[in-house]
Amino acid sequence: MRRLLLLFFILAHSVGLWAQNGRNVTEEWLKENYTKREVMIPMRDGARLYTAVYEPVSNSEAKPVMLVRTPYSLRPYGFEAGEEPSKDRFAYSSGMWGDLLNYAADGYVIVLQNVRGTYLSEEEFENIRPHLSGKAGGKTTKRIVDEATDTYDTVEWLLANTGNNGNIGVKGTSYPGYYATMAALSRHPAIKAVSPQAPVTDWFMGDDAHHNGALCLADCYRFGSSMYRSRKAPSTKGMKRLVSIDSDLYEYFIGKPLSELSAFFGDTLAFWNKMVSHPDYDKFWKDRNPSLHLKDIEPAVLVTGGFYDAEDCYGAFNTYTQLKKLSPECDLYLAAGPWHHGGWRSRSVSSIAGAWFGEASGEYYLDDIEYPFFRYYLEGKGEKPARVNVLPSGETMRSRMEGLPSTSFWEAYSTWPPENASPTRIYLLSLIHI
């Protein structure tokens, strides 16, 4: 009897270590239960990519790897360019908080990587780097590199150098969402599930730089004045914006022709000059559209988007549509709601501007849609979410919606648009009425 009680205590203790929900993870818990190491993972062409690997102290059960690839900062860095990574410094990246905590709570190996040419990662960065490896993905024998081959090489290293169960998940929002799409195109067999969220997809037809071919000056001019810059060498510091617009945007741009704006940047923004020299939807833009290559995708895919996303609403729904069309056998899921860009990453999100749509919609998305999706496909545990989960705008008056949980308003469908749905034309009338 004592042996049974002892066995029960050991099992309960080992399971309990990872049984908490992500909302309960604290800095102290993370430091007690995770180690961090910073490595420079070699790619096939010799370039090395900065990678922060967070590994659970307990190795009682092999767990999956959750990978996020990003061009944005992963501060704090434990070393400077030209130095060797320090093994003694533990400082978690802000990327560990928010939408990754469920995976930390469950003991996943969490990996954050700066893509080629950003921060401490070597070689040159290229905006929405063209997909050159084609159907072969990372298995290509051509002497080329792209985001698919870099993902493939990263996964190979992770499988060999971390304790894991052999399954990899990849997720990301906005630009990292683009890299999640490229992970599916890497064709690595260990990548079982990916989630492109508000993914940069087509910078001409609808995402960031253009909307239906119309140049989005405000977005490009401010975001691009840092993102489109070329760095001189690897660094822990990002590129500063060249411009800061403090006045009214309309007044700022209305009196300036595009040539004047371009002249201000000169040769400092090579991608800006390329972009404005391709005013039509030509090969330059099509080469940078990953959705055109989404054929015969094998990993399960959860696409996430916000109806009020001003940056990459197009990318989410176009990615979903292209996967339905080009990869009908893919296990495809969609989650969408009345969110701004990346709004679902916040557990407490309940409104946008003056419109309210239910409390804690981000919490429901993270706990009841995204996490179960990855857990099912990476561990074979739990149940899959519905194929389509949508939180409609519905009633938006604060007096009626504040305090009501969003769980009451989510709708589930088998596909999107829903079967038997009929389109309705909406017209803007005088006095700004619909």
What are the residue ranges of the model-derived segments?
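Cap/lid segment of the alpha/beta-hydrolase catalytic domain
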Residues: 67-159, 347-357
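Alpha/beta-hydrolase fold nucleophile elbow
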Residues: 163-174
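Glycine-rich nucleophile elbow surrounding the catalytic serine of serine-hydrolase chemistry
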Residues: 173-182
